[in-house]
Amino acid sequence: MYDDALAWAGSVLGSRVVSADPLDGGMTSTMLALRDEAGTVSVLRLMTNEPWRSHGAELSTREREAQLVLVNTPVPAPVSLGLDAEGAATGVAAHLMSRLPGSPLVEVTDAHLDAMADLLATIHAVRPAEPFRTFQSWAWEAKWVVPARSRHPDSWRRAFEVLASPAPAYEPTFLHRDFGHRNLLWADGAITGVVDWVETSTGPAWLDAAHAASNLAVMFDAEPARAFVEKWAATSGTAPVRHWLVMDAVGYLPPPGRPPMFGDPAQQQRLDEWLGLVVDGLS
């Protein structure tokens, strides 16, 4: 099915690809774990899923550029090996990168949250020679519709009012922009990799922290999310900024006419609960 893409990857690697196994995740893309005849393992991203496929050249190029910036930093990011941004050889935008050891979390502990906060500070300390694009909000106004089965409709309305107000000033910071436990690899309790750099941006540090917290709230519950916010406040030496926490939570609402991002009603309920907390300032 991916013969052209695998042939291209083999030409980049200098060794024929002998196996290609799907990796979990990959909302935007098909992610394949490759092994070539020389025994080298790598990962191939193919931008197959809409609407990201239509922006595949931009997204895959940004990921490669971010990984190049990170080569000589303490951030454990994959190494970019090859890019076919226009899909000339592969049919869709393709990015070949090294494969990092480790696996995603299935449960989260206080020690994991500490490690996440420390890594986020390490990411934010990176100073690219040229800044990446200014962040894009995923909470655009067309999404500002109270979820049908919300237990906190007034909280959503207040959230929309927060976003309608001017955003607070911030110090431009290098952002992963999709930072969270889903994009981290772990081994023996330590982070061995941070992946998925297609959304790398410049923006407020609290937006990265907010996204990590929202993910924790939706996938687990509010307690690890609240704990991560507290840990990031301590690590960064800054107070939580409600605007960015609200922006990230609202960003999980679907565009008009689309189903909820999370098909699991329990996840939808946890998002609803988290939004209520962040609107009230996590008091």
For each of these PLM feature ranges, what is it?
Residues 1-19:
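Juxta-kinase regulatory segment immediately upstream of eukaryotic protein kinase catalytic domains
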Residues 51, 69, 104, 184, ...:
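Conserved protein kinase catalytic core
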Residues 202-204, 211-283:
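Helix-rich C-terminal or lid/interface subdomains of diverse kinases
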